[in-house]
Amino acid sequence: MRLVESFLSIQGEGKYAGRLAFFFRFAGCNLRCAGFGGERISPKTGAILRGCDTIRAVFTNHFEHEEILNLSQLLNKIPNLSGSSCFAPACSAPGFCAAESFFESDTLNSAAAQTPFCQKDNGENSLNLTSENSLNFAAQNSLNLDPQSAAASQSAKLYQKPIIVITGGEPMLHHKEALFYEFVCELLARGHAVHFETNGTILVDFEKFPAYKSCVFAVSPKLSNSAEPRERRLNFAALRSLRQNAKDSFYKFVISPEFDAQPEISEILAACESEVYCMPRGADRRELESGAQFCVDFCLKNGYNYSDRLHIRIWGEKDGV
């Protein structure tokens, strides 16, 4: 499992636009989307790579990415915004959740002995969450914290935890991998909202991996202007499963005057209804601005929600934002 980048920013698109967010972009995608017109020169071969706006995450053999070998590599990247080492109450160790002391406590160990869905992982100070019920365990037992921990918990209410946005590429390619799933479970146990950005082609096994039921899915089904074959870009069974099982899900589509998206969006909605957010195409501020009015008119005509692309409006083409 390889990580392209991680960074603190705001969510720039969709239903949760404007929210404080920490992004993890994982390498790997099952689509190329050459029709989107993005181009980048391979630093290894000099070849011109064509695809979407995240070419580094798609053409993985052409770029150097960080190999993720353990959970702490990921958790250590989440920044300190609260004056402590992480977002859990009473943190005590740099970069690792200070709720470790709680995870090591007799309270947890005795509960784990009685609770089949709450199991201690031998390799990391974390919980192996195998049921939705376990996601509430730490929150319920945090009521028994000592006075110092309780004070830290009270001060934690003064700031917002960032949502954790897991993106790619296509992050759900990794959803069955043990380390990836443990990462999601740990984030949820710490009280983070976990959001996935996905193309909706991967059928997620919500029964075997129930923690995903507590996550939000921003789904961007690819239309014919992606230049991907229909059988590769649309998986209606996967879309229906996301809609039925996820904590929340919604569609995002990029709209431009050159392509009539409405017939294809209607087809997707007929197969699986969900909220729709439409965004103007825009690789830079100028293109975004020029397409905004058309996109707004498209939304008004068809009854969809408009979404800006705040990261492009603020930072332009800059990576890592």
Model regions and ranges:
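Conserved AdoMet/S-adenosylmethionine-binding subsite of the radical SAM
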Residues: 159-162, 172-321
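Short, solvent-exposed loop/turn segments at secondary-structure boundaries
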Residues: 16, 63-65, 229-231
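Conserved Radical SAM active-site core
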Residues: 1, 35-123, 128-130, 136-213
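Short aromatic/hydrophobic contact patches that present stacked aromatics
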Residues: 23, 165, 252
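N-terminal pre-triad scaffold of radical SAM enzymes
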Residues: 1-51
